Amino acid sequence: MSERIRVPVALLRRASEVLLNHLESVEGDAVLVEKDYYWTIAAEQLYDAYAEPSKFTMGQLSECLENLERVVEDPSMSTSFALVWLADLLRGAGQTVAR
């Protein structure tokens, strides 16, 4: 069964602003993330809660950071997948600060 969830972009924008302001007040202008590599689950398995994932790959936060720096320098390079890089970095920052 597939359930679609409507996610308002305005909510994402406002939540990002609120949470990044909080992060900045706690950590300053940068977060020192101690781990660079992380596990990812294949996209086709990530949201299948009824099957145990079997396809794992490695991601690298420094690569996500480089990719986002390029997008910021040249917004014409923006792609929807850049949101995944942003999400990976936000997860790394959030998990670092939450410890």
What residue spans do the PLM features occupy?
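Short terminal alpha-helical segments
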Residues: 1-40
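Amphipathic alpha-helical coiled-coil segments with heptad-repeat character
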Residues: 2-5, 9, 13, 51, ...
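Exposed, low-complexity/repetitive linear segments and helix-based recognition motifs
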Residues: 14, 21, 33, 45, ...
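Small side chains
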Residues: 15-16, 42-43, 87, 94
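Charged, low-complexity interaction regions
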Residues: 23-34, 51-55, 73-80
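Short, charged, amphipathic alpha-helical segments
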Residues: 33-40, 59, 80-85
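Long, amphipathic, charge-rich alpha-helical segments that form helical bundles/coiled-coils
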Residues: 43, 50-75
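Amphipathic alpha-helical binding modules
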Residues: 63-99
